[in-house]
Swiss-Prot record:
Keywords: Electron transport, Heme, Iron, Membrane, Metal-binding, Mitochondrion, Mitochondrion inner membrane, Respiratory chain, Transmembrane, Transmembrane helix, Transport, Ubiquinone. Heme b b562 binds at residues 84, 183. Its cofactor is heme b. A ubiquinone binds at residue 202. It comes from Bugeranus carunculatus. Pfam families: Cytochrom_B_C, Cytochrome_B. The cytochrome bc1 complex contains 11 subunits: 3 respiratory subunits (MT-CYB, CYC1 and UQCRFS1), 2 core proteins (UQCRC1 and UQCRC2) and 6 low-molecular weight proteins (UQCRH/QCR6, UQCRB/QCR7, UQCRQ/QCR8, UQCR10/QCR9, UQCR11/QCR10 and a cleavage product of UQCRFS1). This cytochrome bc1 complex then forms a dimer. It is a multi-pass membrane protein. The chain crosses the membrane at residues 34-54, 78-99, 114-134, 179-199, 227-247, 289-309, 321-341, 348-368. This is Cytochrome b.
Amino acid sequence: MAPNLRKSHPLLKMINNSLIDLPTPSNISAWWNFGSLLGICLATQILTGLLLAAHYTADTTLAFSSVAHTCRNVQHGWLIRNLHANGASFFFICIYLHIGRGLYYGSYLYKETWNTGVILLLTLMATAFVGYVLPWGQMSFWGATVITNLFSAVPYIGQTLVEWAWGGFSVDNPTLTRFFTLHFLLPFMIMGLTLIHLTFLHESGSNNPLGIVSNCDKIPFHPYFSLKDILGFMLMLLPLMTLALFSPNLLGDPENFTPANPLVTPPHIKPEWYFLFAYAVLRSIPNKLGGVLALAASVLILFLAPLLHKSKQRTMTFRPFSQLLFWTLTANVLILTWVGSQPVERPFIIIGQLASLTYFTILLILFPIIGALENKMLNY
C-alpha cells in the first residue's frame, strides 16, 4: 500500500500534525476557539493591509488624501479600509477573550506558551499603535505625540529617546515614514511569533476546562474541531462584515476626519477603545514616570500569572471564590475602559484611581490569597 502523502511528505507532515491529526482533548469548549479566530484575524489584517499599502503614501502632505483616495477611487477601497480598521478591533476582542480564557482555566501554567503569548500581545499593541498614526488625522497625530512623549519620562536618556523615535524635534515626516515601515514589518513578526507560540503549545498539548491530564481521552482535531472552528469563523466574520458595511466609523474618532494640524490640539486626546484600560491606569497617577511605569505594569503583570498561582487546582471550574474574583477583575477592566474614554475631571479621576488600585490588588494580592485559602478549604 502506498504511504499516505499527508503523513510522509516533510512539509505536509508538519501541517498534518498541527491541524489534522493533532490529538485534542475531547471536552474543550468554545473558549478554545479564539486561538484559531486570532489566526483568521491576522490573515485578514495582512491581506487587507497589503492591499491598502499598495495605495498608501507615507508622506505628511499626502497620507490623509491617499487614504481618502483609496476610499473614493479604488475598487472596493472603502470596504478594504473599513475591514482593516474594524478588523483591528475584532483582533483585540479575540485576544482579550483568549487571555481571559487562559487566566480562568490556568493555561498560564504552560509557561513558555503563555510568555510567547504575552510577547505577541505586546507586539500586537505596538502594531496597532503605529497603524493608528498612518491616516494622519488629528487624533492620529496627537495620539502619536502624546504616547511617544511618554518615553521622555525615562531618567537621563528620556529626551534623546523621544527625539530618536521621532527622527527630529517633533512628530513629522520621518516619524510617519518609520511608523509605516514598522506597521508593515511587525505583522510578519507576529506571524513568526505565532508559529513559536504553537510550537510550544504542541509540546504540551492543549489544556481543558477541567485542568486535568487528558491523554486518555483525546480525539483528532479534524473533522471535530475544524468544523467547530468554522462555526467560530462565521460567528466572528458576520459581525465584522456588519460593522464594516453598516457603521464603519462607530469605533473610530471623529477627530480623524480632520487632517493633522500641529497648531490645534483636540479637546480630548484618547486612543482607540482597546487601549483605554491601560490609558486610564496611566492617567490615574499624577506623576509622569509613575504613570508610565503603571501603564507598562498593567500589561506586563501578565508575565507574573504563573508565579502567582497558589491553588492546588489548575482551573477555576471548581473554585467559586476565585471565579467571583475573576469576574470582579473583568468588570474592573471594563470600568477602566469606560473611565479612559472620559475627560480628566471629577468624578472620573477618583473612579480611575480606585479601579487602577483594584486591578493591581486583585491580580497581585487577592488571587494568590484566595487560591491558598481554597487549598485550606479542601481539607474540610
